[in-house]
């Protein structure tokens, strides 16, 4: 997919998918992935993002990463665009890029490195190496930390395959300042979902990623349709409706993020299941709170 076409897809809403496991957490539940993706494609979700933070990227082996991606591609059956998360070491990420290219997906998202010792200079070299290795793959960078600065982004804009940024760090004023400096040579996507999408769109975002889209794509579409037509009154109605759910996801210092989405999926007849450690299991009280909230949607 050429960059212009993919930018059009990125300028919409997308789902960051969960990874369902077997009951003992030892295996990827392939059948569950197929069921979940069938639900998403039947609801016309345009862009599916496996192997991200919501997909417990850092809890997957390299083989499992491939299984998740391949299963989702086959399940989507060209009914949605797939963009996978890549990362870890440079060597691992390059292998993931090669696998992605071999599976004919159009784009990848480079996750923000989780490294104990990291510097701006080192991070810049990390991105440059992967952008060069990506070749004809469209690349989205995930801003999830302070070292991916405006200056660094500007230096990386020289790469034609750098097409977008999932922005999920800092204040809205920082995001606004970034767009003022760098313009719209890439697509800016709100990486903090429906809750903050109205504010990011006012500042210049064109799309947003969503976790709740895993089980409530109609809510994501309602938000996007409102934002696309600048109906901010409607957008804020959706924002107010989903805020209690997002508050639950922020519990335990944000550690509730994925298990809350998975529990909601289970309640809706989809396959979420449990998370692998170091993510925790929810209490019965947490699960009831989720049901109480989403039953009003």
Regions found by a protein language model. Give the residues of each.
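Active-site beta->alpha loop and helix N-cap motifs at the rims of alpha/beta catalytic domains
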Residues: 2-147, 154, 265, 280
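C-terminal alpha-helical cap/extension of soluble enzyme domains
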Residues: 2-3, 9-20, 43, 105, ...
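Short, flexible micro-motifs
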Residues: 15, 55-58, 88-90, 167, ...
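Conserved active-site and cofactor/substrate-binding residues in soluble primary-metabolism enzymes
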Residues: 28, 35, 63, 67, ...
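Glycine-rich phosphate-binding "P-loop"
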Residues: 111-114, 161-162, 276
């Amino acid at each position: 997919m050429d960059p212009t076409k993919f930018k059009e897809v990125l300028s919409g809403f997308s789902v960051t998918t969960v990874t369902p496991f077997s009951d003992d957490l030892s295996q990827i539940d392939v059948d569950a992935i197929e069921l979940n993706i069938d639900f998403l494609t039947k609801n016309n979700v345009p862009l599916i993002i496996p192997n991200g933070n919501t997909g417990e990227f850092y809890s997957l082996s390299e083989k499992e990463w491939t299984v998740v991606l391949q299963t989702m591609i086959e399940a989507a059956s060209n009914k949605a665009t797939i963009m996978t998360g890549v990362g870890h070491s440079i060597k691992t990420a390059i292998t993931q890029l090669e696998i992605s290219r071999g599976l004919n997906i159009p784009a990848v998202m480079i996750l923000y490195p989780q490294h104990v010792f990291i510097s701006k200079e080192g991070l810049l070299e990390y991105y440059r190496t992967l952008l060069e290795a990506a070749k004809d793959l469209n690349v989205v960078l995930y801003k999830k930390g302070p070292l991916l600065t405006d200056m660094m982004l500007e230096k990386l804009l020289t790469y034609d395959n750098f097409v977008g940024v999932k922005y999920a760090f800092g204040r809205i004023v920082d995001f606004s300042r970034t767009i003022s400096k760098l313009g719209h040579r890439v697509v800016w996507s709100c990486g903090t979902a429906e809750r903050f999408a109205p504010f990011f769109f006012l500042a210049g975002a064109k799309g947003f990623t969503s976790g709740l889209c895993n089980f409530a794509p109609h809510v994501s579409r309602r938000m996007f349709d409102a934002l696309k037509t600048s109906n901010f009154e409607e957008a804020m109605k959706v924002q107010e409706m989903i805020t209690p759910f997002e508050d639950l996801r922020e519990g335990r210092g944000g550690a509730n993020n994925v298990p809350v989405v998975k529990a909601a999926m289970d309640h809706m007849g989809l396959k979420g299941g449990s998370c692998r450690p170091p993510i925790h299991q929810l209490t019965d009280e947490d699960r009831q709170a989720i049901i109480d909230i989403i039953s009003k949607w």
